Curated annotation (Swiss-Prot):
UniProt keyword annotations, A-Z: cAMP, cAMP-binding, Cell membrane, Cytoplasm, Membrane, Nucleotide-binding, Phosphoprotein, Repeat
Provenance organism: Homo sapiens (Human)
Residues covered by region (Dimerization and phosphorylation): 2-153
Protein known as: cAMP-dependent protein kinase type II-beta regulatory subunit
Residue list for modification Phosphoserine: 83, 85, 114
PTM sites of type Phosphothreonine: 69
Amino acids binding 3',5'-cyclic AMP 2: 276-418
Domain of life: Eukaryota
Pfam family, one: RIIa
Protein family: Belongs to the cAMP-dependent kinase regulatory chain family.
Oligomer status and interactors: The inactive form of the enzyme is composed of two regulatory chains and two catalytic chains. Activation by cAMP produces two active catalytic monomers and a regulatory dimer that binds four cAMP molecules. Interacts with PRKACA and PRKACB. Interacts with the phosphorylated form of PJA2. Forms a complex composed of PRKAR2B, GSK3B and GSKIP through GSKIP interaction; facilitates PKA-induced phosphorylation and regulates GSK3B activity.
Gene it is expressed from: PRKAR2B
Compositionally biased residues, Acidic residues: 84-94
Record-listed 3',5'-cyclic AMP 1 binding positions: 154-275
Record-level GO cellular component terms: cAMP-dependent protein kinase complex; centrosome; ciliary base; cytoplasm; cytosol; dendritic shaft; dendritic spine; extracellular exosome
């Protein structure tokens, strides 16, 4: 007697298993009820529920648990949103002439299944499970490495001893113009921090490819492929001679992944409570937690400055932030020539306007008292918050109304036309 397994059942159960291993729920039955109810609600909301009596299958519902319908990012057109790299390693489409490498069929659910296969639990791993790796460095090399790593969000929450271990374990990799640092479809072996040089990001999807972004002497890539045991979903190619700092998979998982697991426990509930992130799927919200960093500002300290280029997006975790804008020739201005236009408190966000419109910062932000913010860099913002973009774009109209009331003009903050 042969029993036919319904299409998609395996994927559906794998997805559930991953979530159970990740959260370790005390009440498994209640967790299962919430998990499958959430899947059903997400599919109904999108109008893509795939089960019933009209040729629909639970398999399509299972696929939705791993990523669902592709969404558009901020600076990308007509490409599916990927979310397996902090700085674009796993972005979207690649140049049509990028036939030198073959792209795998990218499905976020099947990639997540490999997490279950590896069965890595950072809560159970002993600190000394792996011997410490040390690559000797000259004073000049270590100084350059520290400078390259100082703005890497993944390292922000490491204590001094953990950071020292990371620096010891990193090794220098020199690259030539045209060299492929990582290739789409390969297994993740190292996390890379750019010391110097320029690099292009190529992605091939559905037979159509293009360059989707680039790095200019700064940035990092490759971390989420190591965190989730997923294949590379992009090719990073050097466009000039340069140098990278690499961190091996073992050290990365022992230090970064374990530290990130602690951070995830701290911030999961906070991220899920934010209304503007409701359009993200559960797995996408978890990846937001993975890429955010924490920044603390003292009273009066400037967080962003009007006219500066945009590199980060901020969510207020605690405290209050004052948003001001300079406008000459107005009597209402403060001594520094700026008018207060808004205040942001816990759960509210700022800094998104420049990222949405691709223009310099339209306003400044200062801390009122001690302020703690969650920060996300521009690459992660573009990659992970695509589904939230319509909400943020709708806010532009509100900003314009406020500016017209204050200055008699919208200050030309609207999104530029292409």
């Amino acid at each position: 007697m042969s029993i036919e397994i319904p299409a998609g059942l395996t994927e559906l159960l794998q997805g559930f298993t991953v979530e159970v291993l990740r959260h370790q729920p005390a009440d498994l039955l209640e967790f299962a009820l919430q998990h499958f109810t959430r899947l059903q609600q997400e599919n109904e909301r999108k109008g893509t529920a795939r089960f019933g009596h009209e040729g629909r299958t639970w398999g399509d519902l299972g696929a939705a648990a791993g990523g669902g319908t592709p969404s558009k990012g901020v600076n990308f057109a007509e490409e599916p949103m990927q979310s397996d790299s902090e700085d674009g390693e796993e972005e979207e489409a690649a140049p049509a002439d990028a036939g030198a490498f073959n792209a795998p069929v990218i499905n976020r659910f099947t990639r997540r299944a490999s997490v279950c296969a590896e069965a890595y639990n950072p809560d159970e791993e002993e600190d000394d499970a792996e011997s410490r790796i040390i690559h000797p460095k000259t004073d000049d090399q270590r100084n350059r490495l520290q400078e390259a790593c100082k703005d890497i969000l993944l390292f922000k929450n490491l204590d001094p001893e953990q950071m020292s271990q990371v620096l010891d374990a990193m090794f220098e990799k020199l690259v030539k113009d045209g060299e492929h640092v990582i290739d789409q479809g390969d297994d993740g072996d190292n996390f890379y921090v750019i010391d110097r040089g320029t690099f292009d990001i190529y992605v091939k999807c559905d037979g159509v490819g293009r360059c989707v972004g680039n790095y200019d002497n700064r940035g990092s890539f490759g971390e989420l492929a190591l965190m989730y045991n997923t294949p590379r979903a992009a090719t990073i190619t050097a466009t000039s001679p340069g140098a990278l700092w690499g961190l091996d998979r073992v050290t990365f998982r022992r230090i970064i992944v374990k530290n990130n697991a602690k951070k995830r426990k701290m911030y999961e509930s906070f991220i899920e409570s934010l209304p503007f992130l409701k359009s993200l799927e559960f797995s996408e919200r978890l990846k937001v937690v993975d890429v955010i960093g924490t920044k603390v500002y003292n009273d009066g300290e400037q967080i962003i400055a009007q006219g500066d280029s945009a590199d980060s997006f901020f969510i207020v975790e605690s405290g209050e932030v004052k948003i001001t804008m300079k406008r000459k020739g107005k009597s209402e201005v403060e001594e520094n020539g700026a008018v207060e236009i808004a205040r942001c408190s816990r759960g509210q966000y700022f800094g998104e306007l420049a990222l949405v419109t691709n223009k310099p910062r339209a306003a400044s932000a200062h801390a009122i008292g001690t302020v703690k913010c969650l920060a996300m860099d521009v690459q992660a913002f573009e990659r992970l918050l695509g589904p939230c973009m319509e909400i943020m774009k709708r806010n532009i109209a509100t900003y314009e109304e406020q500016l017209v009331a204050l200055f008699g003009t919208n200050m030309d903050i609207v999104e530029p036309t292409a």
